[in-house]
Design a protein with these regions (language model features):
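Alpha-helical tetratricopeptide repeat
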Residues: 1-172
Length: 172
């Protein structure tokens, strides 16, 4: 229960119908409390609206829930956990909390590097002005920059950072 509404949330998110997306996610959560796809979709809606505090709350809840309940053979759950860390890293990155962003990116990569590899070439060609960095590329870059003296660091490049994509598992 709740999978259909989670798919609706994802579709409304893609259409930038954020209120409808949140409504669909909430219906999914009424049917199945702790529906991980619905929680992730709400977080992605909040990130899209630059409501980072709300997104962070959803992601923190999801991370805590998954870390307590996930089974070793639950590939979707593992991918969702990695995506949650990656998305929390993006929030930290956008809020200029670069050390925390790096920690989240490294955690995401350690959990499931394939789940957070980023969009494929076809998706990039169709949807993005710039090639966005993958979680791995961004983690390596941040790590390199954080080693430099503060006055030499370049941690934000507005044009490129705008293209940073959120991560979600194959199926919410």
């Amino acid at each position: 229960p709740g999978d259909y509404e989670t798919e609706v949330c994802d579709m409304r998110l893609k259409d930038k119908l954020y209120d409808e997306a949140i409504q669909a996610a909430n219906v999914a959560l009424e049917k199945t409390p702790n529906h991980r796809g619905a929680i992730m979709c709400k977080a992605l809606v909040f990130i899209s609206q630059k409501m980072y505090l709300e997104a962070n709350e959803e992601l923190n809840y999801l991370i805590n829930f998954l870390e307590k309940t996930i089974e070793d053979d639950d590939r979707t759950g593992i991918g969702t956990l990695a995506a949650a860390y990656a998305n929390r890293g993006i929030i930290n990155d956008r809020n200029k909390n670069y050390e925390e962003a790096l920690q989240d990116y490294v955690k995401a990569l350690g959990i499931d590097h394939e789940a957070v590899a980023g969009p494929g070439l076809g998706t990039i060609i169709l949807n993005y002005k710039f090639k966005s960095s993958s979680v791995k590329e961004r983690a390596l870059y941040l790590n390199e920059q954080l080693q430099l003296p503060e006055d030499e660091r370049v941690l934000k490049i507005e044009k490129l950072d705008e293209g940073q994509v959120m991560h979600k598992p194959g199926k919410l």
